Amino acid sequence: MVPSLALVPGEPAGIGPELCVRLAQRPRPDAHLIAYADPDTLHSAAKSLSLSVRLLDPDQPARAPGDLPLHPVRQAVATRFGAPDPANAAAVIAGLRGAADACLTGRLQGIVTGPVHKAVINAGGIPYTGTTELLADHAGCPVVMMLANSIVRVALVTTHLPLRAVADAITADALQQCLRITHAAMQRDFGLEDPRIAVLGLNPHAGEDGLLGREELDIVIPVIEQLRGDGMHLIGPLPADTAFLPQKLGGFDAVVAMYHDQGLPVLKYSGFEQAVNITLGLPYPRVAVDHGTALELAGRRIADPSSLMAATALCARLAARR
């Protein structure tokens, strides 16, 4: 059975709507996509691209280029590409929550999300740190953020934290939870019976035997040894500056990084256009683009849909496995 997936464009003034319109030009045999978006914004995006879009009822199949089933989410004000309005923050969140509700009730089997502008959501009076955190809270379960491309998969112990707060957030419980969720997802979603997971140290040179920090000795190594006893194939703690060398990456199925900018620069450098953001641990697959709203590109017909296409293809595969 072909899975039904929500397609949520994110910030309406960014490139998300036009990427969705571009995606609709190629009907997919692997998924039934339903956009959770404002219809006027999608029509405006199509006009800016000189493309056609035909918005269908959610249950209607997309058969021709430009067909896009729609669950309408009305905005408070009309979209001006490149100029986000906090008045539309509630509609952005409503689209995400509506899609999540449909997955939790079994009406849909996954969510593909476009980029959201955190500052605009907060300016609209809605506390928001990220879609990963919002969906985790909505589902009531712990999750892990993983970024992936064709070369490497990187899971994060901490996500959107100031650097000065990272060390305090690296606890035995947090690391163990991240590793357990990552291990389970690699087995269930990626079909790896015995996934090989590399664990990075927090400090330079993985602490250098305590000389450059004790987190490896006091937290990371004890957790790794405990989970190895449970049967997990864990490698580390590894110094982050050499863990991503090509000759080493072939020995890992995933890398667990301690913080956002430890693991993601290498991934984005190695294949930014095809990179995607996967939320591990949810009761349904959620895959997002790995780029921002790109307000400066919105409406200019130059935004690259590669990440959204990759996210949609992966979400369809993950949904089919469940």
Swiss-Prot record:
Pathway: Cofactor biosynthesis; pyridoxine 5'-phosphate biosynthesis; pyridoxine 5'-phosphate from D-erythrose 4-phosphate: step 4/5
UniProt keywords, alphabetically: Cobalt, Cytoplasm, Magnesium, Metal-binding, NAD, NADP, Oxidoreductase, Pyridoxine biosynthesis, Zinc
GO-annotated biological processes: pyridoxal phosphate biosynthetic process; pyridoxine biosynthetic process
Cofactor: Zn(2+); Mg(2+); Co(2+)
Disulfide pattern: none
Annotated InterPro entries: PdxA, PdxA_fam
Protein's name according to its UniProt entry: 4-hydroxythreonine-4-phosphate dehydrogenase
Database matches in SUPFAM superfamilies: Isocitrate/Isopropylmalate dehydrogenase-like
Record-level Gene Ontology MF annotations: 4-hydroxythreonine-4-phosphate dehydrogenase activity; cobalt ion binding; magnesium ion binding; NAD binding; zinc ion binding
Further information: The active site is located at the dimer interface.
Enzyme class label: oxidoreductase
Upper lineage: Bacteria, Pseudomonadati, Pseudomonadota, Gammaproteobacteria, Lysobacterales
Cofactor binding summary note: Binds 1 divalent metal cation per subunit. Can use ions such as Zn(2+), Mg(2+) or Co(2+).
Localization: Cytoplasm
Gene3D superfamilies: Isopropylmalate Dehydrogenase (3.40.718.10)
